[in-house]
Amino acid sequence: MEEVEISTEKKSNPVKSFIAGGVGGMCNVLVGHPLDTIKVRLQTMPTPPPGQPPRYKGVIDCAARTFRYEGFRGFYRGISAPLVGVTPIYAVDFAVYAAGKRLFQTDDHIRLTYPQIFAAGALAGVCSALVTVPTDRIKVLLQTQTVSNGPLLYNGTIDTAAKLYRQGGIRSLFKGTCACILRDSPTGFYFVTYEFLQELARKKSANGKISTTSTILSGGTAGIVFWTLAVPFDVLKSRLQSAPEGTYKHGIRSVFRNLMATEGPKALFRGILPILLRAFPSTAAVFFGVELTNDLLKA
């Protein structure tokens, strides 16, 4: 079984990881939100009537239309929800990951196996998903309402949260919880990929230190691995969270059946191009922010 040496001081302090994760999460949103908006709009556009073209022809067309009708601000529509929620989401993710690794560590330089890293990462994914759901629900509604045929129903994050609560209570805010947990279930692969590449960079380094470039490359690659596995669940989540109440009576199962019946398996990968285009820079930004904060806290 392959093992990787991870310092408890640097990698497995839940309190420091909580702070570093929050900073990394904010870096993620600032870098990745424009492509996230395009991704959500492609995933949630309705099936066109027979003989009619789809609302968007692809990533470039969606980006061009967004800029033409909404300007630069259109790409950052709904950003306040993830920015407000991103600190606890990523803070929980990295804190639980650190706590999970600590469970396997008995001293400051215990060698963890990759299955142990995977287990800690998977646990972190489930816990952070529970925090993610309300902000994801609000973000998706704000990102998609401007391209619907009806009037604007929501005016910002607080207004959306208040209206959702009035409509269906806490349950409405947490619509799509199961789908979100499934979407974040590959988090174990995310952390394994990152730790493996960082350890590889450390071994190849003359002084045993990891450069900023290595952190960016490792983080970006981890993001691509994660999202390649998560895309189908993300499509189902976006469809469910953007649909009017009562559209899918059995939740994610109803979304899946409807999607297969009307659009086929190909629809599960709708929006994959902007997802993968966004995955590298946004995830690289996460780990850059995390490692920079870890270094500052260690100083």
UniProtKB/Swiss-Prot annotation:
Annotated Solcar repeats reside at 12-103, 112-200, 210-296
Q: Which GO terms describe its biological process?
A: carnitine transmembrane transport; intracellular magnesium ion homeostasis; magnesium ion export from mitochondrion; mitochondrial transport
Entry protein name = Mitochondrial magnesium exporter 1
Where in the cell is the protein located? Mitochondrion membrane
Q: Which cysteines are joined by disulfide bonds?
A: none
The record's annotation in InterPro entries points to: Mit_carrier, Mitochondrial_Carrier, Mitochondrial_sb/sol_carrier, Mt_carrier_dom_sf
Q: Where are the transmembrane segments?
A: 79-99, 114-134, 216-236, 272-292
Effect of gene knockout: RNAi-mediated knockdown results in accumulation of magnesium ions in mitochondria, and reduced lifespan. A magnesium-deficient diet rescues the reduced lifespan phenotype.
Answer yes or no on keyword Cytoplasm: no
Question: Could you tell me the membrane topology recorded for this protein?
Answer: Multi-pass membrane protein
Source taxon at top rank: Eukaryota
Which Gene Ontology terms cover its molecular function? magnesium ion transmembrane transporter activity; O-acyl-L-carnitine transmembrane transporter activity
Q: Can you list the GO cellular component terms from the UniProt entry? A: mitochondrial envelope; mitochondrial inner membrane
Q: Any idea what job this protein has?
A: Mediates efflux of magnesium ions from mitochondria, suggesting a role in magnesium homeostasis.
Signal peptide range: none
Keyword field = Magnesium, Membrane, Mitochondrion, Repeat, Transmembrane, Transmembrane helix, Transport
Family, as annotated: Belongs to the mitochondrial carrier (TC 2.A.29) family.
Which Pfam families does the record cross-reference, listed alphabetically?
Mito_carr (PF00153)
